[in-house]
Amino acid sequence: MSSGCLLLLLGLLTLWAELTPVSGRPRLCELPAESGLCNAYIPSFYYNPHSHKCQKFMYGGCGGNANNFKTIDECHRTCVG
């Protein structure tokens, strides 16, 4: 194999390893609960990786991160399995 092919293969394997979560769940499930910048009080759910459960929190309505679900069922489907 040429060195170019080997470098391409190494790069693809590195990319695959970085994008594959170790736990089998999406990386967004590892993010902390973040209420965001606004002041609305929207009941929402986030996955808590320490307790391995979906928990309720109040979302402010803007900003925040992807670990934010409208329903506990959506949180379970995404992060619990």
Swiss-Prot record:
CDD domains documented for this protein: Kunitz_textilinin-like (cd22594)
Protein name: Kunitz-type serine protease inhibitor spermatin
Signal peptide, first to last residue: 1-24
SMART domains assigned to the protein according to its UniProt record, in alphabetical order: KU (SM00131)
Disulfide bond sites: 29-79, 38-62, 54-75
Job description of the protein: Snake venom serine protease inhibitor.
GO CC annotations, alphabetized: extracellular region
Expression sites (tissue/organ): Expressed by the venom gland.
Protein family membership: Belongs to the venom Kunitz-type family.
Keywords (A to Z) from UniProt: Disulfide bond, Protease inhibitor, Secreted, Serine protease inhibitor, Signal, Toxin
Coiled-coil portions: none
A GO term, aspect molecular function: serine-type endopeptidase inhibitor activity
Residue ranges constituting the BPTI/Kunitz inhibitor domain according to the UniProt record: 29-79
Compartments where found: Secreted
PROSITE patterns: BPTI_KUNITZ_1 (PS00280), BPTI_KUNITZ_2 (PS50279)
A Pfam match: Kunitz_BPTI
PANTHER family: KUNITZ-TYPE PROTEASE INHIBITOR-RELATED (PTHR10083)
